[in-house]
């Protein structure tokens, strides 16, 4: 029986740009079904270090929904919501940008407890410039 891998990534995806799209496509190549957590407003938990999104959550949802590589979008408000989502969704791999390698990520303990692989996708924008 072949293994079916559900993947997960998350972010605010404000002003969706080619780097976001490339990252999401790369994540989808590495799993069978990709769930994207959409952070509604990062300033709820971290007003001192994050900016309020320019686009509405509805606009960002529609843009993500237009990507063929996104299978499911789950909006969330807080980091606690993210942890709860990761504790309940059937996911086998979480995709994170390589810029987070070596850093503590939200839900890392849930990944350890549930045996969810954390896969770092290289983040480089130089190949996107022509």
What are these regions (language model features)?
Residues 126-130:
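Conserved small/polar residues in nucleotide/adenosyl-binding loops
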Residues 68-69, 89-90, 113-114:
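Short, structured coil segments at secondary-structure junctions
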Residues 3-40:
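N-terminal catalytic cores of NTP/NDP-binding nucleotidyl/phosphoryl-transfer enzymes
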Residues 85-86, 90-95:
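Proline-aspartate-enriched helix->loop->beta-strand connector
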Residues 23, 32-67:
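Short, surface-exposed acidic-centric catalytic microdomains
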Residues 38, 77, 97-99, 122-123:
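Short secondary-structure boundary segments
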């Amino acid at each position: 029986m072949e293994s079916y891998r559900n993947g997960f990534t998350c972010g605010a995806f404000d002003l969706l740009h080619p780097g976001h799209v490339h990252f999401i496509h790369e994540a989808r190549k590495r799993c069978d079904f990709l769930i994207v957590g959409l952070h509604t407003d990062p300033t709820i938990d971290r007003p001192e270090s994050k900016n309020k999104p320019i686009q509405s959550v509805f606009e960002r949802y529609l843009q993500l929904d237009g990507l063929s590589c996104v299978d499911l979008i789950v909006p969330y408000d807080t980091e606690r919501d993210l942890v709860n989502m990761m504790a309940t969704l059937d996911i086998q791999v979480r995709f994170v940008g390589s810029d987070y390698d070596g850093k503590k990520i939200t839900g890392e303990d849930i990944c350890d407890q549930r045996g969810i692989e954390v896969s770092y996708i290289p983040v480089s924008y130089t190949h996107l410039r022509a």
